[in-house]
Amino acid sequence: MECSEKPVFYNYTGQELAQIRIMPPDEAVRKLVKKHWDTLAKPLDGMGSFESITAQIGAILGTELIDIHKKGVLIFCADNGIVEEGVTQSGQEVTLAVAKSMARKGSSVCRMAQSIRAETIPVDIGINSEESIPGVWNRKVCPGTRNFLKEPAMTEEETVRAIATGIGLVRECKEKDYGILATGEMGIGNTTTSSAVTAALLQCGAEEVTGRGAGLTDQGLARKQQVVRTALETYDLWHADAFTVLQTVGGLDIAGLTGMCIGGALWHIPIVLDGVISMAAALVAERLFPGVREYLIPSHQGKEPAAVKLADALQLSPVIHAGMALGEGTGAVMMFTLLDMAMSIYGQSATFSEIEVEQYRR
């Protein structure tokens, strides 16, 4: 995909965002896809969850002739002011370094995506640097968020712009004929922001959803949990709406991912979710616009403690259980491979009639 480095901003206002309405996927197509699965020469429901997932994809795309060969991974890169509180092993400079690696196609998700010919699209939505990075899309809302122990992470305007950016990027991909997209992110401190968002939305304690991130010590984990707990109490976030939670303790990457989930529902593109950060964003999107979850495909159950709670809240069932915690979109790209395998059966496998065997009946 040709790199669009010139800044593009999407002029949604908060009022315009509030007017968005989500239409459900095409249930008639869902039934057609399920019916086709039953004609294939295999046991009924032999492909398990993948039969219902492909039916969901068909319903989202609005056709039983499913084409997801053109795949993209939108990777939202942003810095988080909360790193000032010692909740991470590394500093903000790592966000910039990894974004540069992504531009060179050298990071983990890029290598995985190249192996299946999926396109990685790193997006600077809020890196704390004025440097322009060739190969990274410039959609910078602001150079990182604020320390949410001192003040809200974002202003209302910044939050709206970040959400709108995610929506707009999905539209750009739709116009370039992408059939399916995966969520990705890179931002030091974003397991802290996602934990705070998750705890607030699920009305649970910091300890229940805050993990070690990139590998904190016991002391570091305790500090991280205390930071999340203090923020929840200071702003009384257990009683706040989803937008306020996102603005107060979220990140620009999470806001962009929230917009991406909404954009998938608006432009009818299936969105494959990665790990807890993407799922926290998905929960924000679903709380803002009920029905968004119907356009989301889970990939893996990560090892962060929030993973199970988020999946349950979204009523999504990840199929990969490998204890992954790499981020970047790696689990979602792994799901791309499994979907391709399932689609090879759906689109090419012999039917009962072709092998002259009576079809199994339900």
Language model regions located:
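N-terminal loops that bind phosphate or other acidic moieties
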Residues: 1-362
